[in-house]
């Protein structure tokens, strides 16, 4: 379950949505394929990403797959059709939108790869984190933790994380965060300036 599912449940979806099953990230077993699908067959275990664009769309081909067909229209599950919480669901452009799961990866672990990991990593890519950068990650829920991991993998020399929950701080430390800021203690920027001798940071990833 993604936090976005909770938001949809309590606050509503983007636009009018009625009688639609939630869920937009997960793993599944293929039960049937269309006649144009070449890379998958019934019985395959697959990873389903949150974004499943139409890859022949102009937006996807220009690098904006999440906006394939319109603003956030690449996010199809539980927005334009039933999501992955249903027993059976349809995946468009299967050859481009599915990934085959190796036998040695269980589905529980693999589910993290469909949205949380790539979202956090993509935030780090968009921030253009470089070797030696000091990076601030705001929010250390699942996506923020993956942003910390991504910044560490790209060679950040120092990672400062904003968050208060002890369990999240412990996990963030395991992924490479060295220092922590609490929004409960006042201005985040002032705390960061104080711990960096007024230098601030090179890159910021917003994940909260």
Where do the model's predicted regions map?
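Mid-domain Rossmann-like dinucleotide-binding core that forms the NAD(H)/NADP(H) cofactor-binding site
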Residues: 100-186, 190
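Short N-terminal strand-loop motif that marks the start
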Residues: 1-26, 86-89, 93, 99, ...
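NAD(P)H dinucleotide-binding glycine-rich loop of Rossmann-like/cofactor-binding domains
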Residues: 54-138
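Glycine-rich beta-strand-centered segment in the early N-terminal region that forms part
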Residues: 10-61, 82, 102-104
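A glycine-rich helix->loop->beta "capping" turn
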Residues: 195-203
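Buried hydrophobic positions in well-ordered alpha/beta secondary-structure cores of metabolic enzymes
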Residues: 5, 28-30, 43, 57, ...
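N-terminal Rossmann-like NAD(P) cofactor-binding module of classical short-chain dehydrogenase/reductase
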Residues: 47, 202-205
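Glycine-rich, N-terminal phosphate-binding loop of Rossmann-like dinucleotide-binding domains
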Residues: 50, 184, 208
